[in-house]
């Protein structure tokens, strides 16, 4: 069984809004070993919800929060599928890195730039009983 401190999972989605890409890697001595990958396809309704939110100038807190939580659950499901595929247990995972799904990105507006990602990292950590690292910037 692998040392818990050596296995990390990374999650990424892109502007194509089609899927979550997941990777599991093991850090050992001075090497990085690929354990495996998994692509988790978004359902059509999820894609529509994300695209809709990306295009709106004004969004209700309920709409934002519901999609944030839904994506947190989907990220957790993608991790579970990856772990099942490669016989990994939550106790083996040191951390999960998740950037989230970008829905607004304005790096150079008149004030200070900003970027907003969805995919509630608290839900991800709770559902998987592990630590996560998120750069949820609002």
Q: Can you describe what each PLM-predicted range is?
A:
Residues 24-31, 108-122:
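A glycine- and small-aliphatic-rich helix-loop capping segment at beta-alpha/alpha-beta transitions
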Residues 129-138:
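Single conserved hydrophobic/aromatic residue that forms the stacking wall/gate
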Residues 101, 125, 129:
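Cell-envelope and extracellular/periplasmic
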Residues 12-62:
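Short glycine-rich, Thr/Ser-proximal phosphate-binding strand/loop in the N-terminal lobe
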Residues 61-118:
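Short beta-strand-loop/turn "lid" adjacent to the catalytic site in phosphate-handling enzymes
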Residues 3-8:
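Extreme N-terminal starter segment of soluble prokaryotic enzymes
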């Amino acid at each position: 069984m692998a040392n818990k401190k050596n296995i990390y999972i990374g999650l990424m989605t892109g502007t194509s809004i089609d899927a979550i890409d997941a990777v599991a890697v093991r850090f050992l001595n001075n090497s990085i070993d690929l354990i495996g990958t998994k692509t988790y396809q978004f359902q059509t309704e999820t894609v529509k919800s994300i695209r809709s939110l990306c295009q709106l100038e004004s969004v209700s807190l309920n709409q934002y929060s519901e999609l944030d939580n839904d994506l947190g659950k989907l990220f957790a499901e993608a991790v579970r599928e990856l772990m099942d595929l490669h016989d990994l247990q939550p106790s083996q995972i040191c951390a999960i890195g998740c950037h989230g799904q970008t829905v607004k990105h304005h790096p150079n507006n008149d004030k200070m730039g900003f970027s907003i990602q969805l995919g509630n990292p608290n839900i991800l950590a709770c559902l998987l009983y592990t630590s996560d690292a998120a750069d949820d910037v609002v």
